Curated annotation (Swiss-Prot):
Residues engaged in binding Zn(2+): C266, C271, H273, C279
Protein name: Small ribosomal subunit biogenesis GTPase RsgA
GO molecular function, one term: GTPase activity
InterPro entries for this protein: G_CP_dom, P-loop_NTPase, Ribosome_biogen_GTPase_RsgA, RsgA_GTPase_dom
Domain CP-type G: 85-242
Enzyme class: hydrolase
Keyword Zinc among UniProt keywords: yes
Residues reported to bind GTP: N135, K136, A137, D138, G184, Q185, S186, G187, M188, G189, K190, S191, T192
Free-text function comment from the UniProt entry: One of several proteins that assist in the late maturation steps of the functional core of the 30S ribosomal subunit. Helps release RbfA from mature subunits. May play a role in the assembly of ribosomal proteins into the subunit. Circularly permuted GTPase that catalyzes slow GTP hydrolysis, GTPase activity is stimulated by the 30S ribosomal subunit.
Biological processes per GO annotation: ribosomal small subunit biogenesis
A GO CC term attached to the entry: cytoplasm
Cofactor: how and how many bound: Binds 1 zinc ion per subunit.
Localization terms from the record: Cytoplasm
Length: 307
């Protein structure tokens, strides 16, 4: 294989017709460029037909050989889940077939409650278990943010504290047996946590990662790693916004653990949970049985959604 090939390290040079299964999993995605891995562990650079971009890291796909180093992705196999975001202009696929979303947050730099709440909604809508990771927990600035996160624990979302290099291992029991994805703002330490969890595997995947990242130290694309035979981990690029235009307004209350038990209890079936008489949501907020701020958040998201 020519040494200048950007994916030369770790990519098979064997005859694909002799070694390739017709299925694979996407282990890295970068625009329209992908890395896929077949069941026997062989990796290939992959492209798509007709410039398709509806594939995500974690997808299990059907492939066809192009040459000894490259394959074409023909289609994806049925998905267990799909995590994505959508605003008024575009849809961005994040990961497929994940069973657990770990939202990595920290007191420094300034954490976004908006992003946290939106990511939790997206996980609920996709049927994905959500966990909050409080990273950099040893920083003195953490105390106030830790207190704010206690509210989400009351909603049933576990909060796990980490200090990246020192005790990333505290995450391992929560990761075990899941297809996991780390998601959060830039600077929260997702990639540092990933490297600490991977250990020596980082060196084995480093060359391909460097080729995809063009030498940058920040994650610019999603990458999937095997922690063991039962556990996978996807590191994803940092986010600042999480559009939810793919959700339906009528379904939103079911994605709120603090409001879903009130669904169907309003006097009017088409209640907007604002000024209508007999609104169970408004009554709960007025009596502090539910958070008024959370009701305002529900109303705000409803206003954003088309139709």
């Amino acid at each position: 294989m020519p040494s200048e090939h950007p994916f030369s390290d770790g990519i098979s040079t064997l005859n694909p017709k002799e070694t390739m299964n017709d299925t694979a999993q996407i282990t890295a995605s970068y625009g329209r460029r992908y890395i896929v891995r077949t069941p026997d562990g062989t990796t290939y650079e992959a492209s798509t037909r007709k410039k398709r971009v509806d594939f995500a890291c974690g997808d299990r796909v059907r492939i066809s050989p192009v040459n000894a180093e490259q394959v074409v992705i023909e289609d994806f196999l049925p998905r267990q889940s799909l995590l994505y975001r959508q605003d008024a202009w575009k849809t961005k696929l994040i990961a497929a077939n994940v069973t657990q979303l770990l939202i990595v947050t920290a007191a420094v730099p300034s954490p976004s409650v908006r992003l946290l709440q939106r990511a939790l909604l997206a996980a609920e809508a996709a049927g994905i278990r959500a966990v909050i990771v409080l990273n950099k927990a040893d920083l003195p600035e953490t105390a106030l943010w830790r207190e704010k996160l206690k509210f989400y624990e009351t909603l049933g979302y576990p909060v796990i504290e980490t200090r990246a290099l020192e005790n990333a291992g505290s995450l391992r029991p929560a990761l075990q047996g899941h297809s996991n994805i780390l998601l959060g703002q830039s600077g929260m330490g997702k990639s540092t946590l990933t490297n600490a969890l991977l250990g020596s595997q980082t060196a084995r995947t480093g060359d391909i990662s460097a080729a995809l990242d063009s030498g940058k130290h920040t994650t610019t694309h999603a990458r999937l790693y095997d922690l063991n035979g039962e556990t996978q981990l996807i590191d994803s690029p940092g986010l600042q916004e999480f559009g939810l235009h793919h959700l339906q307004a009528a379904d939103l209350p079911r994605y709120f653990p603090d409001f879903r038990h009130l669904v169907g209890q309003c006097r009017f079936h088409n209640c907007t949970h604002r000024a209508e008489p007999g609104c169970a949501f408004k009554a709960a907020a007025e009596t502090r049985a539910a958070s008024p701020e959370r009701l305002a958040f529900l109303q705000g998201i409803t206003d954003e959604l088309p139709g």
